[in-house]
Swiss-Prot record:
The keyword Hydrolase appears for this protein: no
Organism the protein comes from: Isodontia harmandi
Main location: secreted
Cellular component terms per the entry's GO annotation: extracellular region
Tissues where this protein is expressed: Expressed by the venom gland.
Signal peptide (residue range): none
Superkingdom, taxonomy of origin: Eukaryota
Entry protein name: Venom peptide Sh41
Subcellular location: Secreted
Keywords, in A-Z order: Secreted
Family: Belongs to the SA81-like family.
Entry keyword annotation includes Nucleus: no
Note: Negative results: does not show activity on voltage-gated sodium channels, potassium channels, and calcium channels. All the following channels have been tested at 10 uM: Kv1.1/KCNA1, Kv1.2/KCNA2, Kv1.3/KCNA3, Kv1.4/KCNA4, Kv1.5/KCNA5, Kv1.6/KCNA6, Kv2.1/KCNB1, Kv3.1/KCNC1, Kv4.2/KCND2, Kv4.3/KCND3, Shaker IR, and Kv11.1/KCNH2/ERG1, as well as Nav1.2/SCN2A, Nav1.4/SCN4A, Nav1.5/SCN5A, Nav1.6/SCN8A, Nav1.8/SCN10A, and DmNav1, and the nicotinic acetylcholine receptor alpha-7 (CHRNA7).
Amino acid sequence: DDLSDFNPKV
């Protein structure tokens, strides 16, 4: 998801 850039899943 592009949202990963804003919400990085660590």
